[in-house]
From Swiss-Prot:
The lineage of its organism: Eukaryota, Metazoa, Chordata, Craniata, Vertebrata. This is Tumor necrosis factor receptor superfamily member 22. GO terms for molecular function: TRAIL binding. InterPro entries: TNFR/NGFR_Cys_rich_reg, TNFRSF10, TNFRSF26_N. Residues 42-198 are extracellular. The chain crosses the membrane at residues 21-41. TNFR-Cys repeats lie at residues 47-82, 84-124, 125-165. It comes from Mus musculus (Mouse). One of its GO terms (cellular component) is external side of plasma membrane.
Length: 198
């Protein structure tokens, strides 16, 4: 009885092994045409001249900025059917996209400086009183720094740069000294001039 059981387990194991091998072989065979198709696409896409793209076994001319490919060409080296970008979408360059790109939206702490058009995205900047904290992330607006009382502002805050404060304190005595220094030089010069003329 034990021998029969071992024989049954052995034949079942072989059957499962063969079944797995056949399944793997079938998957490889099914995948082969797909790999050949990708290889052909890569090969042909390199043969299309600049400004053209590969579609349905032919090279087609790109659509111009502000449009997208509605239907590819059927005759080699011609342009397919291009359609103008719908409102709220754009393409900046000649392309072979099947849809235009959605326009950006300004964040709540930004204001629009240029609206989206068929050929350019919407341009936004930080609102008045805010500046871009990190140029790598233009959406990160921060409140402008206010210089402490008595410290002069060297550069006002704008949408791209924070306020720059002077490193020296603007003291009323310093201003008085700066005003009186040229005045005292003038008085001394007049006195010396009068003495010399006598």
């Amino acid at each position: 009885m034990f021998g029969f059981f071992c024989s049954l387990v052995s034949s079942l194991s072989r059957w499962f092994l063969w079944r797995r091998l056949l399944l793997l072989l079938l998957l490889l065979l099914l995948n082969l045409p797909l790999q050949v198709k990708f290889a052909m696409l890569e090969l042909h896409s390199f043969k299309c001249p600049a400004g053209e793209y590969w579609s349905k076994d032919v090279c087609c001319k790109n659509c111009s900025a502000g449009t997208f490919v509605k239907a590819p060409c059927e005759i080699p080296h011609t342009q397919g059917q291009c359609e103008k970008c719908h409102p709220g979408t754009f393409t900046e360059k000649d392309n072979y996209l099947d849809a235009c790109i959605l326009c950006s939206t300004c964040d709540k702490d930004q204001e629009m400086v240029a609206d989206c058009s068929a050929t350019s995205d919407r341009k936004c900047q930080c609102r008045t009183g805010l500046y871009y904290y990190d140029p790598k992330f233009p959406e990160s607006c921060r409140p402008c720094t206010k210089c402490p009382q008595g410290i002069p502002v060297l550069q006002e805050c704008n949408s791209t740069a924070n306020t720059v404060c002077s490193s020296s304190v603007s003291n009323p005595r310093n201003r008085l000294f700066l005003l009186l220094s040229p005045l005292s030089v003038l008085i001394v010069s007049v006195v010396v001039f009068r003495i010399i003329r006598r």
